Amino acid sequence: ACLGQWDSCDPKASKCCPNYACEWKYPWCRYKLF
C-alpha cells in the first residue's frame, strides 16, 4: 500500500502514492500541485 496525504514517510525512501511527494521539511506525504 502507498502512503497518502499527511502519512508519515522517509524522504530517502518515499513510498507515497502517485501524485504525492514526501516533504523534506516535514516527514509526510503531500499532494503535488504540478
Curated annotation (Swiss-Prot):
Positions of disulphide bridges: C2-C17, C9-C22, C16-C29
Chief localisation class: secreted
Record-linked SUPFAM superfamilies: omega toxin-like
Phenotype for S8A: Weak change in ability to inhibit Nav1.7/SCN9A
Residues where Phenylalanine amide is found: F34
Origin superkingdom: Eukaryota
Other known facts: Synthesis and folding of this linear peptide generates 4 peaks. Only the peak 1 shows a strong activity against Nav1.7/SCN9A. When analyzed in details, this peak shows two forms (P1' and P1''), which may be explained by the involvement of at least one Pro residue in a cis-trans isomerization. Negative results: does not show inhibition on mKv1.1/KCNA1, rKv1.2/KCNA2, rKv1.3/KCNA3, rKv1.4/KCNA4, mKv1.5/KCNA5, rKv1.6/KCNA6, rKv2.1, rKv2.2/KCNB2, rKv3.1/KCNC1, rKv3.2/KCNC2, mKv4.1/KCND1, rKv4.2/KCND2, dog Kv4.3/KCND3, KT3.1/KCNK3, rKir1.1/KCNJ1, mKir2.3/KCNJ4. Shows no or weak activity on Cav1.2/CACNA1C (IC(50)=5.9 uM), Kv11.1/KCNH2/ERG1/HERG (IC(50)>10 uM), and Nav1.8/SCN10A (IC(50)>10 uM).
Name of the protein in question: Mu-theraphotoxin-Pspp1
Source organism: Phlogiellus sp. (Tarantula)
